[in-house]
């Protein structure tokens, strides 16, 4: 059933498309078929973003149904899921769990840093399978970002999207955090949309390339000033 009480801001739709969150894979499991809008010529499935949005709303309402944000644990064992998870936790007050999931973290209280969450959010039910199974043992519901090949066993709220893309995962955690803030505090969802950059993972090679491009742009700007300046202006640039 569609939840029409909260409309998707157009900028969110553009963000999901720009980060390719709407693109699934070639393999589609039976539970995920209902979230597919169509198929491209290369057999890649395309998600129905209207259904994705409805699941975003449902997940946000489940989060807001708890009295305290730290009752929720957000998990990602993926390298590129670390930054969006940490930023989401910072924004919403949830607990974060990144890197390798230690077996028994939810079921064995003698383990260091063990916790008893009332709700967990995972970036990939395949990679984060151990966390989902342990949550099920302690009757803790699970929200998961699910691709077309995901098995929804023990997943209570599946948000259908491309969870293999670092940009898509970052955008998805950003959107979910904005919906939660809107429901809790009435903060406009599309306010300061550029903050989505804070949720994006960038590997060291990409950061180095960006730095090189920036340095090159600065060099070109200075070079153009010198080449286009007359004698008087040249002196002003040098001693500015």
Curated annotation (Swiss-Prot):
GO CC annotations on file: cytosolic small ribosomal subunit
What are the recorded GO MF terms, alphabetically?
Answer: structural constituent of ribosome
Q: Which CDD domains match?
A: RPS2
Predominant location category = cytoplasm
Q: Which Pfam families does the protein's record reference?
A: Ribosomal_S2
A single Gene Ontology biological process assigned to it is: ribosomal small subunit assembly
InterPro entries in the record: Ribosomal_uS2, Ribosomal_uS2_euk, Ribosomal_uS2_euk/arc, Ribosomal_uS2_flav_dom_sf
**Keyword field:** Cytoplasm, Ribonucleoprotein, Ribosomal protein
Q: Where in the cell is it found?
A: Cytoplasm
Q: Family membership, please give it.
A: Belongs to the universal ribosomal protein uS2 family.
Instruction: State the oligomer form and interacting partners.
Output: Component of the small ribosomal subunit. Mature ribosomes consist of a small (40S) and a large (60S) subunit. The 40S subunit contains about 33 different proteins and 1 molecule of RNA (18S). The 60S subunit contains about 49 different proteins and 3 molecules of RNA (25S, 5.8S and 5S). Interacts with RPS21.
Q: Which PANTHER family match?
A: 40S RIBOSOMAL PROTEIN SA (PTHR11489)
This chain's function reads: Required for the assembly and/or stability of the 40S ribosomal subunit. Required for the processing of the 20S rRNA-precursor to mature 18S rRNA in a late step of the maturation of 40S ribosomal subunits.
| UniProt-recorded name of the protein | Small ribosomal subunit protein uS2
